[in-house]
Amino acid sequence: MDLMELNLEAEETTQIIVIRLGDEQYGVDIKFIDNIVRMQHITRVPQVPAYLKGVINLRGEVIPVMSVRLKMGLPVDEIDKNSRIIILKLDTHGSIGIIVDQVKEVVTLETASIEKVSYDGKDDRINYIYGIGKCEGGLISLLDFSAVLAE
């Protein structure tokens, strides 16, 4: 296999980290993930929306932390030993941490197997999903953090 074939293969697949929020599984494109850390003390910030939980200090960098559960209209976070903060690096918003119930695994999806989602107007959560990935374990809703952070 030469370099050209490797590049084509890389473009045809996407690595996704599978996370759990409540009873649902979601996927986060690995290219946006900078770090995954255990839960730690989050310093509250006054006069911010409820889904913005506060900030953490990660190796000298102050990073805002949000609850994706609250942003998506799910019940309040249930923090336990499996809870993690995923640090995302986004071009438009810099670094931000998101609280997840569990980081499950990394899966590789074929780009062709990702189906786009069309909005049906019934559930606002669909606005935060850019596609559905098909893998051996079933279907994974792929989170669109540009939409989650847009408001």
Q: What is each residue range found by the language model?
A:
Residues 1-151:
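An acidic, low-aromatic, low-complexity terminal/linker signal
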